[in-house]
Amino acid sequence: MPDRELISGDRQAEDAQFEVGLRPRRLADFTGQSKLKENLSIAIEAARMRGEAMDHVLLYGPPGLGKTTLASIIAEELQVQFTPTSGPVLQKKLDLTGILSNIRLHQVFFIDEIHRLLPDVEEMLYSALEDFRVDILVGVGPGARTHSLPMPKFTAIGATTRQGLVSAPLRGRFGLVLRLDPYNTEELKAIVKRSARLLTVEIEDGAAEEIARRCRGTPRIANRLLRRVRDYAQVRADGRINQKVAQTALNLLDVDRYGLDEIDQKIMMTILEKYRGGPVGVNTIAASISEESETIEEVYEPYLIQLGFLNRTPRGRVATELAYDYFKVKRKLREGDHPSLFEA
Protein backbone atom coordinates (compact mmCIF):
# COMPACT_ATOMS: atom_id res chain seq x y z
CA MET A 1 0.00 0.00 0.00
CA PRO A 2 1.19 3.57 -0.66
CA ASP A 3 1.93 6.11 2.05
CA ARG A 4 -1.56 7.13 3.23
CA GLU A 5 -0.61 10.80 3.28
CA LEU A 6 0.58 10.64 -0.33
CA ILE A 7 -2.89 9.87 -1.70
CA SER A 8 -4.93 11.68 0.93
CA GLY A 9 -6.90 14.73 -0.16
CA ASP A 10 -6.22 16.35 3.22
CA ARG A 11 -3.70 19.17 3.18
CA GLN A 12 -0.23 18.08 4.30
CA ALA A 13 2.44 20.40 5.71
CA GLU A 14 4.53 20.16 2.53
CA ASP A 15 1.60 21.18 0.32
CA ALA A 16 1.33 24.76 1.58
CA GLN A 17 4.45 26.20 -0.05
CA PHE A 18 3.57 24.68 -3.45
CA GLU A 19 -0.20 25.29 -3.50
CA VAL A 20 0.11 29.06 -3.22
CA GLY A 21 2.13 29.26 -6.43
CA LEU A 22 -0.03 26.78 -8.32
CA ARG A 23 -3.48 28.11 -7.44
CA PRO A 24 -5.41 29.86 -10.21
CA ARG A 25 -6.45 33.41 -9.31
CA ARG A 26 -9.36 33.87 -11.73
CA LEU A 27 -12.50 31.82 -12.25
CA ALA A 28 -11.68 31.44 -15.95
CA ASP A 29 -8.41 29.70 -15.03
CA PHE A 30 -10.07 27.23 -12.64
CA THR A 31 -10.37 23.84 -14.37
CA GLY A 32 -13.50 21.68 -14.00
CA GLN A 33 -16.64 22.12 -11.86
CA SER A 34 -18.39 23.83 -14.80
CA LYS A 35 -21.89 24.06 -13.28
CA LEU A 36 -20.55 25.35 -9.96
CA LYS A 37 -18.41 27.93 -11.78
CA GLU A 38 -21.40 29.14 -13.77
CA ASN A 39 -23.41 29.63 -10.57
CA LEU A 40 -20.54 31.53 -8.97
CA SER A 41 -19.91 33.60 -12.09
CA ILE A 42 -23.53 34.77 -12.14
CA ALA A 43 -23.52 35.57 -8.41
CA ILE A 44 -20.22 37.48 -8.66
CA GLU A 45 -21.31 39.49 -11.69
CA ALA A 46 -24.70 40.30 -10.15
CA ALA A 47 -23.05 41.53 -6.94
CA ARG A 48 -20.63 43.69 -8.93
CA MET A 49 -23.41 45.18 -11.07
CA ARG A 50 -25.47 46.08 -7.99
CA GLY A 51 -22.49 47.22 -5.94
CA GLU A 52 -23.52 44.86 -3.14
CA ALA A 53 -21.94 42.12 -1.08
CA MET A 54 -22.34 38.72 -2.70
CA ASP A 55 -24.58 36.13 -1.01
CA HIS A 56 -22.91 33.91 1.58
CA VAL A 57 -21.56 30.68 0.04
CA LEU A 58 -21.19 27.19 1.51
CA LEU A 59 -18.80 24.95 -0.46
CA TYR A 60 -18.76 21.24 0.34
CA GLY A 61 -17.17 18.10 -1.03
CA PRO A 62 -14.21 15.76 -0.46
CA PRO A 63 -10.89 17.34 0.56
CA GLY A 64 -8.44 18.65 -2.02
CA LEU A 65 -10.94 19.65 -4.72
CA GLY A 66 -10.38 23.42 -4.54
CA LYS A 67 -12.73 24.89 -1.93
CA THR A 68 -10.09 27.23 -0.49
CA THR A 69 -8.91 28.15 -3.99
CA LEU A 70 -12.46 29.06 -5.04
CA ALA A 71 -12.93 31.20 -1.93
CA SER A 72 -9.79 33.20 -2.74
CA ILE A 73 -10.88 33.47 -6.40
CA ILE A 74 -14.24 34.93 -5.34
CA ALA A 75 -12.44 37.64 -3.36
CA GLU A 76 -10.12 38.29 -6.30
CA GLU A 77 -13.02 38.55 -8.76
CA LEU A 78 -14.90 40.90 -6.42
CA GLN A 79 -11.67 42.86 -5.82
CA VAL A 80 -12.15 42.80 -2.06
CA GLN A 81 -10.07 41.79 0.94
CA PHE A 82 -9.83 38.06 1.75
CA THR A 83 -9.70 37.01 5.41
CA PRO A 84 -9.29 33.26 5.99
CA THR A 85 -9.69 31.28 9.20
CA SER A 86 -10.92 27.82 10.18
CA GLY A 87 -13.41 26.25 12.57
CA PRO A 88 -10.80 24.74 14.93
CA VAL A 89 -9.04 28.12 15.28
CA LEU A 90 -12.19 29.86 16.55
CA GLN A 91 -12.16 28.37 20.04
CA LYS A 92 -13.89 31.25 21.86
CA LYS A 93 -16.50 33.89 21.05
CA LEU A 94 -13.76 36.47 21.51
CA ASP A 95 -11.80 34.90 18.62
CA LEU A 96 -14.74 35.42 16.28
CA THR A 97 -15.52 38.88 17.67
CA GLY A 98 -11.97 40.01 16.93
CA ILE A 99 -12.33 39.07 13.26
CA LEU A 100 -15.89 40.33 12.78
CA SER A 101 -15.13 43.70 14.36
CA ASN A 102 -12.46 44.32 11.71
CA ILE A 103 -14.43 43.26 8.65
CA ARG A 104 -14.75 45.90 5.94
CA LEU A 105 -17.53 46.57 3.45
CA HIS A 106 -18.11 43.68 0.99
CA GLN A 107 -15.08 41.79 2.32
CA VAL A 108 -14.85 37.98 1.93
CA PHE A 109 -14.58 36.12 5.24
CA PHE A 110 -13.60 32.47 4.68
CA ILE A 111 -14.13 29.76 7.32
CA ASP A 112 -12.55 26.42 6.44
CA GLU A 113 -13.80 23.29 8.25
CA ILE A 114 -16.89 25.22 9.26
CA HIS A 115 -18.49 22.03 10.58
CA ARG A 116 -15.97 22.11 13.46
CA LEU A 117 -17.20 25.40 14.95
CA LEU A 118 -18.05 25.13 18.64
CA PRO A 119 -21.79 25.61 19.34
CA ASP A 120 -21.49 28.94 21.18
CA VAL A 121 -19.19 30.35 18.48
CA GLU A 122 -21.57 29.14 15.78
CA GLU A 123 -24.55 30.80 17.47
CA MET A 124 -22.69 34.09 17.56
CA LEU A 125 -22.11 33.79 13.83
CA TYR A 126 -25.86 33.57 13.11
CA SER A 127 -26.61 37.27 13.70
CA ALA A 128 -23.51 38.29 11.73
CA LEU A 129 -24.59 36.23 8.70
CA GLU A 130 -28.27 37.14 8.79
CA ASP A 131 -28.50 40.64 10.26
CA PHE A 132 -24.92 41.89 9.88
CA ARG A 133 -24.53 42.63 13.57
CA VAL A 134 -22.44 41.25 16.41
CA ASP A 135 -24.05 40.60 19.78
CA ILE A 136 -21.59 41.15 22.62
CA LEU A 137 -22.31 40.34 26.25
CA VAL A 138 -21.02 43.08 28.54
CA GLY A 139 -20.65 42.43 32.26
CA VAL A 140 -21.34 39.33 34.34
CA GLY A 141 -24.17 37.99 36.43
CA PRO A 142 -27.59 39.71 36.73
CA GLY A 143 -26.15 43.01 35.52
CA ALA A 144 -24.86 41.60 32.24
CA ARG A 145 -26.28 43.19 29.11
CA THR A 146 -26.13 42.39 25.40
CA HIS A 147 -24.92 45.09 23.04
CA SER A 148 -25.53 44.77 19.30
CA LEU A 149 -22.84 46.27 17.12
CA PRO A 150 -23.72 46.87 13.45
CA MET A 151 -21.37 45.45 10.81
CA PRO A 152 -20.73 46.36 7.18
CA LYS A 153 -22.28 43.90 4.75
CA PHE A 154 -19.81 41.18 3.83
CA THR A 155 -19.64 37.76 2.15
CA ALA A 156 -19.01 34.71 4.30
CA ILE A 157 -17.72 31.57 2.59
CA GLY A 158 -17.79 28.32 4.52
CA ALA A 159 -16.03 25.16 3.40
CA THR A 160 -16.59 21.65 4.68
CA THR A 161 -15.83 18.05 3.79
CA ARG A 162 -18.71 16.97 6.05
CA GLN A 163 -21.86 18.76 4.96
CA GLY A 164 -23.97 16.45 7.12
CA LEU A 165 -22.28 17.86 10.23
CA VAL A 166 -23.18 21.47 9.39
CA SER A 167 -26.24 22.31 11.48
CA ALA A 168 -29.47 23.22 9.68
CA PRO A 169 -29.62 26.74 11.22
CA LEU A 170 -26.10 27.50 9.99
CA ARG A 171 -26.60 25.93 6.56
CA GLY A 172 -29.83 27.89 6.12
CA ARG A 173 -27.98 31.19 6.40
CA PHE A 174 -25.97 30.55 3.21
CA GLY A 175 -27.60 31.78 0.01
CA LEU A 176 -25.52 29.48 -2.20
CA VAL A 177 -24.79 25.87 -1.21
CA LEU A 178 -22.52 24.29 -3.83
CA ARG A 179 -20.95 20.85 -4.06
CA LEU A 180 -17.55 20.09 -5.59
CA ASP A 181 -17.31 16.66 -7.23
CA PRO A 182 -14.22 14.58 -8.08
CA TYR A 183 -12.60 15.61 -11.36
CA ASN A 184 -12.46 13.45 -14.47
CA THR A 185 -9.20 12.35 -16.09
CA GLU A 186 -9.20 15.01 -18.81
CA GLU A 187 -9.70 17.81 -16.28
CA LEU A 188 -6.92 16.44 -14.07
CA LYS A 189 -4.63 16.02 -17.06
CA ALA A 190 -5.09 19.73 -17.83
CA ILE A 191 -4.36 20.59 -14.18
CA VAL A 192 -1.18 18.47 -14.18
CA LYS A 193 0.07 20.09 -17.40
CA ARG A 194 -0.64 23.58 -16.05
CA SER A 195 1.18 22.81 -12.77
CA ALA A 196 4.13 21.31 -14.65
CA ARG A 197 4.37 24.47 -16.73
CA LEU A 198 4.40 26.63 -13.59
CA LEU A 199 7.05 24.36 -12.06
CA THR A 200 9.05 24.60 -15.32
CA VAL A 201 8.96 20.82 -15.79
CA GLU A 202 8.69 19.28 -19.26
CA ILE A 203 5.93 16.64 -19.30
CA GLU A 204 4.41 14.57 -22.11
CA ASP A 205 0.66 14.07 -22.55
CA GLY A 206 0.88 10.37 -21.69
CA ALA A 207 2.72 11.12 -18.45
CA ALA A 208 0.20 13.79 -17.44
CA GLU A 209 -2.61 11.31 -18.08
CA GLU A 210 -0.83 8.63 -16.04
CA ILE A 211 -0.70 10.95 -13.03
CA ALA A 212 -4.29 12.08 -13.64
CA ARG A 213 -5.57 8.49 -13.55
CA ARG A 214 -3.94 7.75 -10.20
CA CYS A 215 -4.88 10.81 -8.15
CA ARG A 216 -8.38 9.86 -6.97
CA GLY A 217 -10.06 12.65 -8.94
CA THR A 218 -8.32 15.18 -6.67
CA PRO A 219 -6.15 18.11 -7.87
CA ARG A 220 -4.23 18.32 -4.59
CA ILE A 221 -3.13 14.69 -4.94
CA ALA A 222 -2.33 15.25 -8.63
CA ASN A 223 0.02 18.10 -7.75
CA ARG A 224 1.58 16.06 -4.95
CA LEU A 225 2.23 13.11 -7.27
CA LEU A 226 3.61 15.46 -9.92
CA ARG A 227 6.20 16.71 -7.45
CA ARG A 228 7.24 13.15 -6.59
CA VAL A 229 7.50 12.19 -10.26
CA ARG A 230 9.49 15.37 -10.94
CA ASP A 231 11.98 14.34 -8.23
CA TYR A 232 12.34 10.90 -9.81
CA ALA A 233 12.79 12.37 -13.29
CA GLN A 234 15.55 14.70 -12.11
CA VAL A 235 17.45 12.00 -10.20
CA ARG A 236 16.87 8.87 -12.31
CA ALA A 237 16.14 10.30 -15.78
CA ASP A 238 17.00 13.40 -17.78
CA GLY A 239 14.54 15.69 -15.97
CA ARG A 240 11.79 15.27 -18.54
CA ILE A 241 8.67 13.33 -17.60
CA ASN A 242 7.46 10.82 -20.19
CA GLN A 243 4.91 8.07 -19.60
CA LYS A 244 7.51 5.44 -18.74
CA VAL A 245 9.16 7.73 -16.17
CA ALA A 246 5.76 8.53 -14.64
CA GLN A 247 4.75 4.85 -14.48
CA THR A 248 8.05 3.80 -12.93
CA ALA A 249 8.00 6.58 -10.33
CA LEU A 250 4.37 5.96 -9.34
CA ASN A 251 4.88 2.20 -9.15
CA LEU A 252 7.91 2.81 -6.93
CA LEU A 253 5.62 4.82 -4.64
CA ASP A 254 3.08 1.93 -4.61
CA VAL A 255 0.36 4.17 -6.02
CA ASP A 256 -2.45 1.98 -7.34
CA ARG A 257 -3.44 2.60 -10.98
CA TYR A 258 -6.68 4.14 -9.67
CA GLY A 259 -5.10 5.70 -6.58
CA LEU A 260 -7.16 3.51 -4.24
CA ASP A 261 -6.19 3.59 -0.58
CA GLU A 262 -6.75 1.15 2.28
CA ILE A 263 -10.23 2.46 3.16
CA ASP A 264 -11.39 2.27 -0.47
CA GLN A 265 -10.25 -1.33 -0.62
CA LYS A 266 -11.87 -2.18 2.72
CA ILE A 267 -15.19 -0.75 1.56
CA MET A 268 -15.16 -2.67 -1.70
CA MET A 269 -13.92 -5.96 -0.25
CA THR A 270 -16.56 -5.76 2.50
CA ILE A 271 -19.30 -5.38 -0.10
CA LEU A 272 -17.84 -7.97 -2.47
CA GLU A 273 -16.89 -10.70 -0.02
CA LYS A 274 -18.79 -10.21 3.23
CA TYR A 275 -22.09 -9.15 1.64
CA ARG A 276 -21.75 -10.91 -1.73
CA GLY A 277 -21.79 -7.72 -3.74
CA GLY A 278 -24.77 -6.11 -2.00
CA PRO A 279 -27.17 -4.50 -1.72
CA VAL A 280 -25.93 -3.46 1.72
CA GLY A 281 -26.63 -0.32 3.74
CA VAL A 282 -23.95 2.29 4.36
CA ASN A 283 -24.38 1.99 8.14
CA THR A 284 -23.66 -1.73 7.92
CA ILE A 285 -20.53 -1.07 5.85
CA ALA A 286 -19.43 1.59 8.33
CA ALA A 287 -19.82 -0.80 11.27
CA SER A 288 -17.90 -3.50 9.41
CA ILE A 289 -14.83 -1.34 8.76
CA SER A 290 -15.02 0.87 11.89
CA GLU A 291 -15.57 4.07 9.93
CA GLU A 292 -18.26 6.76 10.16
CA SER A 293 -21.08 6.40 7.63
CA GLU A 294 -20.96 10.14 6.82
CA THR A 295 -17.26 9.84 5.96
CA ILE A 296 -17.96 6.92 3.64
CA GLU A 297 -20.80 8.80 1.92
CA GLU A 298 -19.06 12.15 1.57
CA VAL A 299 -15.37 11.25 1.15
CA TYR A 300 -15.01 7.75 -0.30
CA GLU A 301 -18.19 6.85 -2.20
CA PRO A 302 -18.11 9.68 -4.77
CA TYR A 303 -14.81 8.47 -6.19
CA LEU A 304 -15.77 4.77 -6.12
CA ILE A 305 -18.99 5.63 -7.95
CA GLN A 306 -17.08 7.75 -10.47
CA LEU A 307 -14.77 4.79 -11.17
CA GLY A 308 -17.80 2.60 -11.83
CA PHE A 309 -17.06 0.22 -8.93
CA LEU A 310 -20.15 1.05 -6.87
CA ASN A 311 -23.82 1.88 -7.40
CA ARG A 312 -26.24 3.48 -4.95
CA THR A 313 -29.68 1.87 -5.05
CA PRO A 314 -32.83 2.29 -2.91
CA ARG A 315 -31.92 -1.01 -1.20
CA GLY A 316 -28.27 -0.13 -0.53
CA ARG A 317 -24.82 -0.18 -2.10
CA VAL A 318 -24.14 -2.67 -4.89
CA ALA A 319 -20.77 -3.62 -6.39
CA THR A 320 -20.53 -3.59 -10.19
CA GLU A 321 -19.08 -6.18 -12.55
CA LEU A 322 -16.12 -3.84 -13.03
CA ALA A 323 -15.43 -4.07 -9.29
CA TYR A 324 -15.50 -7.89 -9.39
CA ASP A 325 -13.02 -7.85 -12.26
CA TYR A 326 -10.66 -5.29 -10.75
CA PHE A 327 -10.53 -6.83 -7.26
CA LYS A 328 -10.40 -10.36 -8.73
CA VAL A 329 -13.30 -11.61 -6.64
CA LYS A 330 -15.48 -14.42 -7.95
CA ARG A 331 -19.17 -13.70 -7.64
CA LYS A 332 -20.86 -15.84 -4.96
CA LEU A 333 -24.43 -16.97 -5.47
CA ARG A 334 -27.01 -15.92 -2.91
CA GLU A 335 -29.55 -18.35 -1.55
CA GLY A 336 -32.26 -18.81 -4.17
CA ASP A 337 -30.03 -17.68 -7.05
CA HIS A 338 -29.51 -20.07 -9.95
CA PRO A 339 -26.12 -20.46 -11.62
CA SER A 340 -25.84 -19.47 -15.24
CA LEU A 341 -24.95 -22.01 -17.92
CA PHE A 342 -21.29 -20.95 -17.61
CA GLU A 343 -21.21 -21.17 -13.78
CA ALA A 344 -22.94 -24.56 -13.53
Swiss-Prot record:
Renumbered residue ranges of the record's region Small ATPAse domain (RuvB-S): 184-254
GO cellular component, one term: cytoplasm
UniProt: ATP binding residues: L22, R23, G64, K67, T68, T69, E130, D131, F132, R173, Y183, R220
SMART domains given in the database record: AAA
Gene Ontology terms describing biological process: DNA recombination; DNA repair
Residues that, per the record, bind Mg(2+): T68
Localization in the cell: Cytoplasm
Pfam family, any one: RuvB_C
Chain residue ranges for the region called Head domain (RuvB-H): 257-344
Transmembrane intervals: none
Its EC number(s): 3.6.4.-
UniProtKB keywords: ATP-binding, Cytoplasm, DNA damage, DNA recombination, DNA repair, DNA-binding, Hydrolase, Nucleotide-binding
Reactions performed catalytically: ATP + H2O = ADP + phosphate + H(+)
HAMAP family linked: DNA_HJ_migration_RuvB
Annotated domain remarks: Has 3 domains, the large (RuvB-L) and small ATPase (RuvB-S) domains and the C-terminal head (RuvB-H) domain. The head domain binds DNA, while the ATPase domains jointly bind ATP, ADP or are empty depending on the state of the subunit in the translocation cycle. During a single DNA translocation step the structure of each domain remains the same, but their relative positions change.
Record note on quaternary structure: Homohexamer. Forms an RuvA(8)-RuvB(12)-Holliday junction (HJ) complex. HJ DNA is sandwiched between 2 RuvA tetramers; dsDNA enters through RuvA and exits via RuvB. An RuvB hexamer assembles on each DNA strand where it exits the tetramer. Each RuvB hexamer is contacted by two RuvA subunits (via domain III) on 2 adjacent RuvB subunits; this complex drives branch migration. In the full resolvosome a probable DNA-RuvA(4)-RuvB(12)-RuvC(2) complex forms which resolves the HJ.
Protein purpose: The RuvA-RuvB-RuvC complex processes Holliday junction (HJ) DNA during genetic recombination and DNA repair, while the RuvA-RuvB complex plays an important role in the rescue of blocked DNA replication forks via replication fork reversal (RFR). RuvA specifically binds to HJ cruciform DNA, conferring on it an open structure. The RuvB hexamer acts as an ATP-dependent pump, pulling dsDNA into and through the RuvAB complex. RuvB forms 2 homohexamers on either side of HJ DNA bound by 1 or 2 RuvA tetramers; 4 subunits per hexamer contact DNA at a time.
Protein name: Holliday junction branch migration complex subunit RuvB
Species assigned in the record: Solibacter usitatus (strain Ellin6076)
Lineage: Bacteria, Pseudomonadati, Acidobacteriota, Terriglobia, Bryobacterales
Originating gene: ruvB
